[in-house]
């Protein structure tokens, strides 16, 4: 993850893109053909000035990925699946793909993770197994600026959303996993637990939860 404002600022992108290309090289040296990261908030309107800035950066990384055989997977979250799908379609690169995080879609974008699987199907190469719920909707631009700048005024993240152990949030795991199977996805369900008093116990529970769901 490039941190800061990801790939949303033209003046920062040459250095960040170059570093990302080297990260892809390193991943291949380590035997991995997928790199995942956040790219920033994709505007819903293609006419937004930031859209072209992000296109240029992602197209450069995608074209390099096509050349060397490494896929660059954008983690879902700040924008709805239909917006991300349109953005990816506009790039024309096989290697710009998706790391589907169902909890981010539900917690931040207020999107349906099951429908997102179908919308993003051609691009999904990796997934996170994470759960949570939205408490109050807030503009994802504000939330992701908090992560970039470390300040969110009088708003607290715990007032926006809550990450929860698997099965305790709003992700409909039966339907979600069935949707992944339906598009032929047989890759990783990478458990992600970033908060809570005992993340290790939550991860162990998540392993058993997924085993039961996949049985």
Residue map of PLM features:
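Active-site acidic/histidine proton-transfer and metal-coordination neighborhood
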Residues: 4-98, 107
């Amino acid at each position: 993850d490039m941190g800061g404002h990801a790939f949303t600022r033209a003046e920062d992108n040459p250095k960040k893109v170059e570093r990302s290309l080297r990260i892809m090289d390193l991943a291949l040296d380590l035997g991995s053909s997928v790199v995942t990261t956040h790219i920033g908030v994709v505007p819903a309107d293609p006419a937004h000035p930031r859209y072209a800035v992000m296109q240029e950066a992602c197209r450069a990384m995608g074209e390099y990925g096509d050349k060397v055989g490494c896929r660059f997977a954008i983690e879902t979250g700040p924008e709805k699946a239909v917006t991300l799908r349109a953005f990816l379609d506009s790039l024309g690169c096989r290697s710009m793909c998706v790391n589907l995080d169902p909890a981010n879609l539900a917690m931040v974008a207020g999107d349906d993770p099951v429908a997102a699987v179908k919308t993003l199907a051609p691009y999904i190469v990796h997934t996170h197994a994470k759960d949570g719920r939205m408490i109050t909707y807030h503009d994802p631009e504000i939330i992701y600026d908090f992560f970039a700048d470390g300040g969110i005024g009088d708003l607290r993240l715990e007032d926006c959303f809550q990450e929860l152990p698997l099965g305790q949030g709003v992700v409909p795991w039966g339907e979600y996993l069935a949707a992944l199977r339906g598009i032929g996805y047989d890759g990783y369900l990478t458990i992600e637990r970033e908060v809570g008093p005992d993340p290790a116990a939550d991860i162990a529970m998540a392993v058993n939860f997924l085993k039961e769901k996949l049985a």
